[in-house]
């Protein structure tokens, strides 16, 4: 299974989105859950990726059918859904993203995804990519069943939320054991597994566990660290 190297985009800038594609990322996560801009900024970010080989995955705030439909109609290659805790919630993601008979997404052939009617699919409608975020102890317990849902392409760990949830519940489960369990569930069902990578030193461990969707930090974090580093250099001159 191919390893996809990506990054999270929270700033909402088409220029930054375009730059990420120019740099060669396999995918970008355009964030509507924690991002700085509203849904209205999304179409121009997707336009910035046109002509590139970079996949556009949009994190929706929740799998509301109208929101998921608009995101995919605008041309996103797939969605990431936060806080998928149960099989029913995973199936709800598939229902919102897929056309009948697999789901209940409404059909319009004049949307941007199909060139406003100029690039209609010749055969079967394209399949959206669906990344289900595993971010709680409950989700870890259901990871095997979630991975078994047809239409879910990968389990994606939210490290911050998962760590917080385990601490808030005083869970006896060690974080690393949860990561291992999620990765195993994905492997057992031939699904991808992903995570937001905070430390480059984790590379070998994640590779050994079979992670295939890796997000290398975010645009805001990279800008922040660049600002801090340059300011530190400038102040050393004074």
Predicted regions and their residues:
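Conserved N-terminal beta1-alpha1 strand-loop-helix module at the mouth
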Residues: 1-64, 95, 130, 148-152
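Conserved, mostly hydrophobic/aromatic
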Residues: 7, 20, 31, 71, ...
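Glycine-enriched alpha-helix->loop->beta-strand junction motifs that scaffold or abut catalytic
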Residues: 23-27, 73-78, 97-99, 149-154, ...
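Conserved beta-strand positions in the central sheet of alpha/beta enzyme cores
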Residues: 28-29, 57, 80, 156, ...
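Alpha-helix-loop-beta-strand connector modules within alpha/beta enzyme cores
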Residues: 39-73, 95-102, 123-125, 172-194, ...
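C-terminal alpha-helical cap/extension of soluble enzyme domains
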Residues: 64, 105-116, 134-141, 173-238
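Conserved anion-binding
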Residues: 66, 76-150, 159-163
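Glycine-rich phosphate-binding active-site loops on the catalytic face of alpha/beta enzymes
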Residues: 78-92, 155-166, 211-230
